[in-house]
């Protein structure tokens, strides 16, 4: 990651490295690097396990006019900064989105980015969408919710003076990215350079932990954000539907991974699931009165005339204690 910045053709930058209380030699390595590179500053905080906390700490220290946030496993291509800063200087935009190059362990990769005509299934796509447009932040938010926009952001610093990163859950930065889109007046794309994402199964976001059962808060907050900005009911209903799917997936995840946790951890997770359920409130259209499909802790079901429920796919191995707890 650091080498990809040091090797940039643009050199007027500052590197702020924040170590999230690691127990290896990370901080020592960073401080040694800073001795030989005055543009690199190394800091450490007590371990949180929440990326947004680390990012907000770095934001407070950042002094530059533009802002790029990288994870330690990832990198940027050689002309990333040079082309981005020139575009900022020549055009009145607030965010530039770059394609993402996903690198896998078998040296295979795929490049995705831009605006797509149809909802994007990342596992099936390996091509760029439209990148020759400048769009409003409001449209970018809408495209992203419908899974038609993807890109890695390079910010004008003013965006993050207004909005920091959400710290409610370990994936709070996913909420903040969309909030930043809304804050921007104009958003552009560069498709000749890439953000390189190394798909690491052992990264903090891949490991199963209690924090996974907080991820529902991101979409709960996105629903409130969309309502606050007076988006159409169709979009808000889309978010609401995603929230029910997340609840369902988290219930399945608990059933499959329960054996990994202590009894105390199980109780914490169950309380998080209950909190999630208590914040769910379905948004219906007039057509949903006759019947609609939905999901909950028991499985997938159809609701008829808002009264009768038929489960057509139940969650296998549903723990009796779990079912009792989530329905009391």
Feature roles, as predicted:
Residues 19-28, 47-48:
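A conserved acidic beta->alpha catalytic loop
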Residues 1-7:
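Short, well-formed alpha-helical segments that are part of the catalytic scaffolds
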Residues 25, 74-87:
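Acidic donor-binding/catalytic loop of UDP-sugar-dependent glycosyltransferases
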Residues 127-215:
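Conserved nucleotide-sugar donor-binding catalytic segment
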Residues 254-328:
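Membrane-interface aromatic/basic loop that binds lipid-linked glycans or pyrophosphate carriers
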Residues 67:
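Short aromatic/hydrophobic "clamp" motif used to bind/position activated sugar donors
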């Amino acid at each position: 990651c650091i080498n990809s910045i040091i090797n940039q053709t643009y050199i007027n930058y500052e590197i702020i490295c924040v170590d999230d209380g690691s127990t290896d030699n990370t901080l020592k390595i960073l401080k040694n690097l800073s001795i030989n590179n005055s543009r690199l500053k190394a800091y450490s905080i007590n371990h949180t396990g929440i990326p947004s906390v680390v990012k907000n700490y770095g934001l407070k220290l950042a002094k530059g006019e533009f802002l790029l946030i990288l994870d330690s496993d990832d990198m940027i291509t050689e002309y990333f900064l040079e082309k981005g800063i020139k575009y900022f200087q020549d055009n009145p935009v607030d965010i530039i989105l770059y394609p993402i190059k996903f690198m896998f362990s078998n040296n295979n990769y795929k490049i995705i980015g831009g605006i797509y005509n149809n909802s994007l299934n990342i596992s099936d796509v390996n091509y760029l969408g439209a990148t020759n447009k400048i769009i409003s932040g409001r449209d970018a938010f809408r495209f992203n919710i419908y899974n038609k926009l993807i890109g890695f952001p390079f910010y004008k610093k003013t965006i993050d003076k207004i909005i920091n990163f959400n710290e409610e859950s370990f994936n709070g930065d996913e909420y903040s990215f969309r909030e930043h889109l809304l804050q921007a007046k104009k958003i552009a794309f560069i498709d000749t350079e890439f953000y390189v994402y190394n798909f690491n199964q052992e990264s903090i976001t891949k490991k199963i932990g209690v924090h996974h059962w907080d991820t529902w808060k991101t979409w709960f907050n996105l629903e409130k954000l969309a309502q606050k900005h007076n988006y159409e009911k169709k979009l808000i209903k889309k978010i609401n539907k995603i929230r029910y799917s997340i609840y369902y997936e988290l219930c399945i995840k608990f059933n499959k991974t329960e054996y990994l946790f202590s009894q105390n951890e199980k109780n914490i997770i169950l309380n998080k699931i209950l909190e999630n359920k208590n914040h769910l409130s379905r948004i219906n259209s007039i057509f949903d009165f006759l019947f609609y499909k939905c999901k909950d802790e028991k499985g997938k079901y159809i609701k008829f005339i808002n009264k009768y429920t038929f489960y057509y796919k139940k969650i296998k191995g549903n723990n009796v204690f779990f079912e009792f707890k989530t329905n009391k």
